[in-house]
From Swiss-Prot:
Function: Specifically methylates the N4 position of cytidine in position 1402 (C1402) of 16S rRNA.
SUPFAM superfamilies membership: Putative methyltransferase TM0872, insert domain, S-adenosyl-L-methionine-dependent methyltransferases
Catalytic activity: cytidine(1402) in 16S rRNA + S-adenosyl-L-methionine = N(4)-methylcytidine(1402) in 16S rRNA + S-adenosyl-L-homocysteine + H(+)
Name of protein: Ribosomal RNA small subunit methyltransferase H
Protein's cellular compartments: Cytoplasm
InterPro entries, A to Z: RsmH, SAM-dep_MeTrfase_MraW_recog, SAM-dependent_MTases_sf
Length: 309
């Protein structure tokens, strides 16, 4: 299958980077190369782009899409490791970094990846297929209490306790091997009247995907390391697709903008923690009505941007 992915908030994200033609930029989630291509259009031959992705299919697709550009470095890795990646490339500071945290259309549409609750496929959900932990491992090996906490915390699923119990009961008969089997278990666990609010498996699949790929743990560290690697006035632009991610970005940006831990009664700061960034987006930028109509997957997207000071 061809790697297809419509870049969300494309114009807004590129504008937010305030691109310098000779600058160095990092696309932490290369995907099909949509954002990267627009960055490269604004760079001179002296500028440089580092494209990172943990999915080899994404890197292959991006190389084809960006084949006319010679100032691209492709890195098969997780952006959690951005600090060591730049270290290995002997790059100290960069002028801008973007993260698009959404699952690509390709990953959702290719049934064999196991991300979609709309298509029956083996339980997988690994962004990086070289990793050992898959959705199969989570569903069939995690204890009931662990499953409950994952569904509750990562999926904000109100029926997390019941779904976890139903999963454990079903797997005692036979291992749960496909997304279709999991969807049926979820349907049986959620009362019919609550299944009118979108697909009943949506929150559970989100939660399992986040657990498999350690998405939230990765994000906190990646934001800190990215800010440390920015030049003065460099920008960090992050697109999120659900409230858990957005909350992490919002809170981390606030911590980095106002890190002082002194009591409010202190007349001056004595903790020595200096502000590292200025938040550009007091409220997140959301897709236009037109974009939401054209690309339904953009509806929940939010863009937050900060500037290194």
């Amino acid at each position: 299958m061809e790697f297809k992915h419509i870049s969300v908030l494309l114009e807004e994200t590129i504008d937010s980077l305030n691109i310098k033609e000779d600058g160095v930029y990092v696309d932490c989630t290369l995907g099909g190369g949509g954002h990267s291509k627009e960055i490269l259009k604004k760079l001179s031959h002296k500028g440089k782009l580092i494209g990172i992705d943990q999915d080899t299919s994404a890197i292959k697709a991006a190389k084809e899409r960006l084949k006319d550009y010679e100032n691209v470095i492709y890195v098969h890795n997780n952006f959690y490791n951005i600090d060591s990646i730049l270290e290995e490339l002997d790059i100290d500071k960069v002028d801008g970094i973007i993260m698009d945290l959404g699952v690509s259309s390709y990953q959702l549409d290719e049934a064999s990846r196991g991300f979609s609750y709309m298509k029956d496929a083996p339980l997988d959900m690994r962004m990086n297929r070289e990793e050992n932990l898959s959705a199969y491992g989570v569903i069939n090996n995690y204890k009931e209490e662990e499953l409950f906490k994952i569904l509750k915390n990562y999926g904000e699923e109100k029926f997390s306790r019941k779904i976890a119990r139903f999963i454990v009961e079903k797997r005692t008969e036979n291992p749960i091997e496909t997304t279709g089997e999991l969807v049926e278990i979820i349907r049986k666990a959620i009362p019919a009247k609550f299944q009118r609010e979108g697909h009943p498996a949506k929150r559970t699949f989100q939660a399992i995907r986040i657990e498999v790929n350690k998405e939230l743990q990765i994000l906190n560290k990646a934001i800190e390391d990215s800010v440390n690697r920015l030049n003065k006035d460099g920008r960090l632009s992050i697109i999120t697709f659900h409230s858990l991610e957005d909350r992490i970005v919002k809170v981390k940006f606030k911590e980095l903008e106002k890190p002082c831990t002194c009591p409010p009664s202190f007349p001056i700061c004595v903790c020595g923690k200096e502000p590292q960034i200025k938040i550009i987006t007091k409220k997140p930028i959301e897709p236009s009505k037109e974009e939401k109509e054209i690309n339904s997957r953009s509806r929940s997207a939010k863009l937050r941007v900060c500037r290194k000071i």
